[in-house]
Amino acid sequence: MKSISIYTITRNQNIEQLQKLERQLSGRDYFLKMREWELESMKALTAELETCMEDVYALRFFYSFQIPRLGKEFDLLQIKEDQIVNIELKSGVVSDEAICRQLLQNRYYLSVLGRTIHSYTYISSQNRLVRLTKHDLSLIHISEPTRPY
């Protein structure tokens, strides 16, 4: 499986064409059933990133990455030599406790790779990006200049 440009994948409006494009770009052996709300959240996140980044088109993530046998899914995952960026997408209101629990669980699974992990959740209905620090959540303003991705 290959990482894909989230900018590219959010330009296509037709879900069937998008599934074909995602399969071609990622190299999956099957068509991924894309959820409409997740696509809309990804579009909203990409639009926000465009306001503060010139090269959003270059951001590459593994979309809907699953750990075999565990069935654990990561919405957006970027793996580099020295760090991992995990972004979970939400469309509706989710409690901070639920977000924290999910991000801590994700961090646990990803920690075996031995890299610095940056964990985020983007809630599109609130246009809210939160980051997991050590064990707490902090609100991030997307326009902040320090971005790990």
Task: Give a label for each model feature.
Residues 85, 90-138:
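Nucleic-acid nuclease catalytic cores
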Residues 73, 88, 144:
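Acidic-residue sensor for enzyme active/binding pockets
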Residues 140-149:
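Single conserved hydrophobic/aromatic residue that forms the stacking wall/gate
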